[in-house]
Amino acid sequence: MKYYRYMLAALAVTLMAGCTNLDETIYDQVSSENYYNTQMDVVRAVFRPFEHAYWSIQSRHQLEELSGDLVATWKKDDWWEDGGRWSRLHYHTWTVEDELIKNEWVGCFTGIMQCNYVLDDLNTLDPEKYNFSTEEYNNLKAQCRTLRAWFYTRLLGSYRNVPLAVSRDVSLNSEGQVEPRELFDFIEKELRECVQLLDAKDGAAGNGTVQGQWNRAGAAALLVRLYLNAEKWIGESKYTECAALAQQILNGDFGSYALGKTWDEVFDWDNENCQEVLFAFPSAKGYSHYVYSGDLFWWTVPARTIANYLGDTKAGNGDHNCKYGLAPSFAPDGTPYTTELGRPAAKFKKYTEDYRLKLYRNLGDNKREGMMLFGYLDYEENGKAKRVVSPTGDEDLYLRDAVGNFKGCGPDEIPADRTSDMLHGDHSSGWRFVKYPLYMDTDEGQMESDFVEIRLAEVIYSLAECRFREGKVNEAATLLNTVRRRNYPENAVAKYLYAPEGPVTLTQAELLDEWGREFFHEGRRRTDLIRFDKFCKGVWWDKTPDKDNHTEIFPLHRDVLSSNPALKQNTGY
C-alpha cells in the first residue's frame, strides 16, 4: 500500500534522533493538537516508538544471555569486574538494587507508554483529513498495538507480574499488577486482532523498503513465541495452538517466506532482501545502529587491536570490547568439562564441519566466513605479518576455550594457578565470536545489517519442539533438518542430520543444544532454559543449581516499587 512506502523516510527521521535516557517522554513539548498537521506527521508519530524499541534490546539481551549457560562476562585482568554485576547475573544472585534489572522494566514501559500516547492520538484523529483509507489507518494502529504486545511479552517473560497500561488515561490502566493470565490474554487478543489488520508481506522477496514494519507473519510469530512459553508463563500448555499457528506461517498463510540459503544470509548487510526475516529493526551506519555501537556486536570480540584484524578501523564507534565470551569447554589444565549444559564450543564441535566453527575472516566485497575467533589472530599490516595483541599490549593474544590466568603461557602450557571462575580470567580466556558481520572499511555493507528480531527458523524450531513434546520425534527431527542442512558441506551433510534422515539421535538434551547453536547469542537463552526446566536446576561452568525456582523471574527494582505503592515484590525477593 502506497502510504507505507513513506515509512522509510519516516524511519530515517526517527532513527537519527536516538534515545537519550529511559525516562524520556516524547510528547512533553508538543501537544497532539498542533503536532499532526500532515500525513507524514502521523506516520512519524506511529514509528517513533520503534526507534526506542530498537534501543531497548540491549537490556533484554544482557538479562537473557548473561544469566544463561552459553556466554559470560568474567573478569579479564582488571577489566569487567564492575562491582560484581555480571557475576550476579551468572550466579543468579541479582538483587533489588541491580540497575540491569531496572533497565528492562523501565525500557519496556517507556516503549509501552509511547505506543499508548500514539494510539490515544490516533483514536481522536480523522483519517480522512490525512488522506488515509480505513484499511491503511487500521494498519497504522496495528503497528503500535503489535509493538506494545512485543514489549508486554518481554515483561511477562521477565517479571510475570506487571501492571497493564493501555492508555495515558490512568483510569483505564491497572493500579497495581495484574495476574499473568490476564496479561497473557491481553497480548493474545491484541496479536490475534492485529494479524487481521496488518498487511501481509508483498511478494516472495524480503521485506525490502518496509523492513521495520510489523506484518501479519511477524505478529503471528509473536503469538507462536507466546504460546511456546505459555506453560511456564501461565501454567497452561499451549503447544497445540503454537503448532497450529506455526504451521500456518510455514504454509504461507500470512505471506511468502523461505530460509536463507546460507547460515549467515539472515544476518548479512543486505538482509532486508532475505526471505527468512519476519521482523527486523533497520540499521544503518549513518543512522541508528545501537547493536553495533555498543554491547551486542561490537563487544563480542577482543578489544583494541582486533580492528586491525577485521580491517574496520574507521567504523567510527571507538574500540571494540571484550564483554561477551563463550563459556569454556575446558579447565585451565586442559581437562574437558562434562556438564550437560554450557560448553558451547564443544557443542558446535560435535558436528565438526559446521561452517560456523570456522575462524571469522572478512573476505572483501561484503563477504565473510566463519563465526568464531580463537587461537592467534594473524593479519598483515604494510606488508608485515602481525598478530592481535592483548589489550594490555604486553603479549600476543591467544584465545583458548578455557577461563583462567594464562598470562605468559604458550598455547600448550598450563598456568600455575588453575582457578577458573568469574573472578579469575584474563584477555586470553574464552573464544569470541562474530555473528553479525563486522565488515572492513572498504565494504559498503559495513555496519548495515538490520537487527533480526524474528526469523522463519524460529517458527520452524518452535513447531519442531511442539512435535517433539507430542512424541512425534521423527517429525521434529525432519523440521530441524530443514534448517540444519545449510550449516554443513553438501557432500557431508548426511552424517550430521537427525534420524530418520541421518544417524544422529534427537533427544530432549540435543533439542535444547540445537536451540543454543542455531540461536546462539540472539537474546533468548534464559527463556529457552526455563522452558526446558534447566535454568534453576541446571549445572554449567562455575554455576551450581539455584536453591529454588524463584529466580525464573526477576525482582522489581527498589526504585520501581517506591514509585508505585500498589506494586508488590515478586516472591522470593
PLM regions and their residue ranges:
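An aromatic- and glycine-enriched ligand-binding surface/loop that stacks and positions planar moieties
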Residues: 20-83, 192, 213-405
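Conserved, well-structured interaction surfaces
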Residues: 38-56, 79-159, 174-185, 191-206, ...
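Long, intrinsically disordered, low-complexity segments
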Residues: 18-21, 39, 50, 79-81, ...
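Short coil/turn linking the two alpha-helices of tandem helical-hairpin repeats
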Residues: 154-163, 202, 226-235, 471
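C-terminal substrate/ligand-recognition segments
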Residues: 102, 363, 367-483
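Sec-dependent bacterial lipoprotein signal peptides
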Residues: 1-17
